[in-house]
Design a protein with these regions (language model features):
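Glycosyltransferase donor-sugar binding loop
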Residues: 39-45, 216, 244-259
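A conserved mid-protein helix/loop that constitutes part of the nucleotide-sugar donor-binding site
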Residues: 16-24, 211, 220-235, 258
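Short hydrophobic beta-strand element within catalytic cores of glycosyltransferases
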Residues: 314-318
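Conserved acidic donor-binding segment of nucleotide-sugar-dependent glycosyltransferases
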Residues: 319, 329-342, 350-356
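Aromatic "clamp/platform" in nucleotide-sugar-dependent glycosyltransferases that forms part
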Residues: 278, 297
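Nucleotide-activated donor-binding/catalytic signature segment of Leloir-type glycosyltransferases, i.e.
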Residues: 258-277
Length: 390
């Protein structure tokens, strides 16, 4: 097959989950003998954070054939004006920009690649392909979160592209229901994210001088919310003097990073809570951990959580968090707690004080996440691609 991946957003230097999935998808399908190309749209130029095989053509429609496209100032003003009272309407300006300035470049990519099937990474890309260009090439629209959001925060003009898609992939069964509730006739398939199945496992049986609670993810205030973990640990630090917290991930704005530093200082945890920055070796980080804390407000799937489970770490998250509340089975491979700092503290405390419980939860975590093995997930994807390709 000749597969085109259309992830029409940033890729350069991006350490986020979507960029990771994009490069993993491209690599896996190439290894399986398929031709793979990537089209993306990035303000910046440069190297990807996650390596892309040098034999996979990558086309940036913002910087295409010697021509760079800047976002016009008048559209920026228009977008910011709308954003003050209607974020959904503000996002329509991005679609307006794409349709006005990027469509010809995308059309040229299609003519160059001539794919048998296109995997679109967002409804905006599907809109450009199916509604604006009206391509007859089958488009499979991926979802990286709860599709319920499509009907509240995404431009309404993108919705018809979902119905025009050959099939819409969702990550979890509950997400399929959300999409079908709004679009009963849309074709759907449930395929989770591929989680590496590690041969090694965190050693939860060892007696250690220092035990670690780990957080891995972007340091974002309203999404990942690592400040809640710091606050929860502040109430546990004296009770558990041989436990520390490590926060791994790129900062998402200097103001919030400073806020985290001040919070650590406020609770006198400078020698107990550490901001470690991003890492290119997540498995090595996870292998040294004892508990994985994931205080997100929402998740599309939770790749970092899945990887922690694969390393055999018990996990703690919030009941209210989408995806997390499906990956964590309360009392089986970790704990789901009510919102707030105190419930998070109690859930962590329960695991911290009982090594046998940690071992049991960690073993179950590794077992439960096996259904998301890369082999099984990519097999599902390859089957779907073959079914809908020209």
């Amino acid at each position: 097959m000749n597969i085109l991946l259309a992830n029409l957003t940033k890729m350069v230097g991006d350490s986020g989950g979507m960029a990771k999935v994009t490069c993993a998808f491209a690599h896996e399908m190439k290894v399986r003998g398929h031709r793979v190309s990537l089209v993306y749209s990035d303000v910046q130029t440069g190297d990807f954070y996650y390596p892309l095989d040098k034999d996979i053509p990558a086309y940036d429609i913002r910087h295409y054939k010697g021509k760079s496209i800047s976002y016009p100032w008048y559209l920026k003003v228009k977008r910011e004006f709308y954003r003050t009272f209607d974020k959904q309407k503000a996002r329509t300006v991005n679609d307006e920009f794409a349709a006005s300035f990027l469509l010809d470049h995308l059309k040229d990519v299609l003519q160059t690649v001539q794919p048998d099937v296109i995997v679109s990474f967002q409804p905006a890309a599907s809109k450009m392909l199916l509604c604006d260009l009206q391509t007859k090439i089958p488009v499979i629209t991926m979802s990286h979160g709860d599709p319920e959001d499509y009907f509240h925060t995404y431009p309404k003009e993108e919705i018809p592209a979902l119905e025009k898609s050959a099939v819409c992939q969702v990550l979890l069964p509950s997400f399929e229901k959300h999409l079908k509730d709004h679009l009963p006739n849309v074709k759907t398939v449930v395929i989770g994210n591929a989680i590496p199945q590690y041969d090694v496992q965190a050693d939860l049986s060892a007696q250690k001088d220092t035990y670690k609670i780990l957080f891995v993810g972007r340091l974002s205030k309203n999404h990942k919310r690592p400040h809640l973990l710091i606050e929860a640990f502040a109430g546990l630090a004296d009770e558990f003097p041989n436990w520390n917290v490590e926060l791994w991930g790129a900062e998402d704005g200097k103001a919030y990073y400073k806020e985290l530093q001040l919070l650590i200082k406020k609770h006198h945890l400078e020698n107990r809570v550490f901001l470690k920055g991003p890492t290119n070796d997540v498995p090595s980080v996870l292998q040294q951990g004892d508990i994985f804390a994931f205080p997100s407000a929402y998740e599309g799937f939770g790749l970092a959580l899945g990887e922690a489970m694969s390393m055999g770490l018990p996990a703690v998250g919030y009941k209210s968090c989408s995806a997390v509340n499906e990956l964590i089975k309360d009392g089986e491979n970790g704990y789901l707690c009510d919102d707030g700092v105190e419930p998070l503290k109690i859930a962590l405390q329960k695991i911290m004080k009982n090594q046998n419980l940690r071992k049991k939860l960690g073993w179950n975590a590794k077992k439960i996440i096996r259904k998301y093995s890369s082999f099984l997930i990519w097999n599902m994807w390859e089957k779907i691609l073959k079914r809908y390709s020209i």
